[in-house]
From Swiss-Prot:
Keywords: Periplasm, Signal. This is UPF0312 protein Pmen_0419. Its main location: periplasm. Belongs to the UPF0312 family. Type 1 subfamily. InterPro entries: Lipid/polyisoprenoid-bd_YceI (IPR007372), TTHA0802/YceI-like_sf (IPR036761), UPF0312/YceI (IPR023480). Residues 1-22 form the signal peptide. One of its GO terms (cellular component) is periplasmic space. Pfam families: YceI (PF04264). It is found in: Periplasm. The lineage of its organism: Bacteria, Pseudomonadati, Pseudomonadota, Gammaproteobacteria, Pseudomonadales. NCBIfam families: PRK03757.1 (NF002994). SMART domains: YceI.
Length: 191
């Protein structure tokens, strides 16, 4: 779910970034330059952080016509990692992500709207735990340019907040833990 959101963020940021023509990008997961992280309140006293280690995605954008941009991301929900094996096992269970039944989460953008210089709202359909809901990712363009290996890259960050019960995740964690914030950091390689 985080990965999908991240891909959407990258797309929206790129749209307002600085390219003069339409371009297709692949999210750089091989070089470990893309992350789908999350945080959720732990009992209202602190934050629990985690990440999804296996995801893939692509985006296309045209700075001259951001509304035509698209983003698509697929995330392996079993790749969740909170740095605690027993907790990760519980998150993968039917109490939360139910990975045996819903092994992937996806994000498909439906619209991109510029919100200012270098920022955009990326709206799309997030499918998580077998439930599809619209989400909006607040995206920010970080930068773009040539890399040392002859390629061209663009980077973005984004955030969105999800209500767990919207995705049929109903395990009672207390009132301080009803939402999860997705924190996306994406770098794409122009194809």
């Amino acid at each position: 779910m985080l990965k999908n959101a991240l891909a959407a963020l990258v797309l929206g940021s790129a749209l307002i970034g600085g390219q003069a023509m339409a371009a297709d990008y692949a999210i750089d997961k091989q070089g470990q330059h893309a992350f789908v992280n999350f945080k959720i309140s732990h009992l209202g006293y602190s934050w629990l952080y985690g990440t999804f280690k296996d995801f893939d995605g692509k985006f296309s954008f045209d700075a001259a016509n951001p509304e035509a941009s698209k983003v698509s991301v697929t995330l392996n929900t079993a790749s969740v990692d909170t740095n605690h094996a027993e907790r990760d096992k519980h998150i993968r269970s039917a109490d939360f992500l139910n990975v045996s039944k819903h092994g992937t989460a996806t994000f498909e953008s439906t619209s991109v709207k510029s919100t200012g210089e270098g920022t955009a709202d990326i709206t799309g359909d997030l499918t998580l735990n077998g439930v599809t809901k619209p989400v909006v990712i607040a995206a920010k363009f970080i930068g773009e340019g040539k890399d040392p290996w002859g390629g061209y890259r663009a980077g973005f960050e984004g955030t969105t907040t999800l209500k767990l019960k919207d995705f049929d995740i109903t395990k009672d964690l207390g009132p301080a833990s009803e939402t999860v914030e997705l924190i996306l950091s994406i770098e794409g390689i122009r194809q």
